[in-house]
Swiss-Prot record:
The gene is rplS. It comes from Mesomycoplasma hyopneumoniae (strain 232). SUPFAM superfamilies: Translation proteins SH3-like domain. This is Large ribosomal subunit protein bL19. The keyword Ribosomal protein applies. It holds the Pfam family Ribosomal_L19. The lineage of its organism: Bacteria, Bacillati, Mycoplasmatota, Mycoplasmoidales, Metamycoplasmataceae. GO terms for biological process: translation. InterPro entries: Ribosomal_bL19, Ribosomal_bL19_CS, Ribosomal_bL19_sf, Translation_prot_SH3-like_sf. Belongs to the bacterial ribosomal protein bL19 family. One of its GO terms (cellular component) is cytosolic large ribosomal subunit.
Length: 121
């Protein structure tokens, strides 16, 4: 009985996003509150981790800003995440791309693949 109730509550909070996976370059629009004002900030980078766990699914995006690696973890179904855009899909053979942290320059390149259509999660 409790499992069904939890499932019903969770299903109302799940949001639809384009399908993406580790190795994809994404642009994440998320809300930031500064004082009493709310604005949308964009974080663009490579998805190095994606954990699917129902309502608490999360993903880590890494980008290089001023020669410093910046990583940010986002909850997929958070109300603070406005939208996620897939910019480019890359061919990878791992689920977690932690080895990309050590790479820079040409060694950090990934081979692009073409996706015909994006499906919703």
């Amino acid at each position: 009985m409790q499992a069904k109730l939890i499932e019903i509550l969770e299903s109302s909070q799940i949001r639809l996003y384009p399908q993406f996976q580790p190795g994809d370059n994404v642009r994440v629009y998320f809300k930031i509150q500064e004082g009493n004002k709310t604005r949308i900030q964009i974080f663009e980078g490579l998805v190095i981790k994606f954990k699917k766990n129902g309502l608490s699914s999360n993903f880590v995006v890494r980008k290089i800003s001023h020669n410093v690696g910046v990583e940010r973890t986002f909850l997929l179904h958070s109300p603070l995440v406005e939208k996620v855009e897939v910019i480019r899909s890359n061919k990878v053979r791992r689920a977690k791309l932690y080895y990309m942290k050590k790479r820079s320059g040409k060694s950090a390149r990934l081979k692009e693949i073409k996706r015909k259509e994006l499906k919703n999660l």
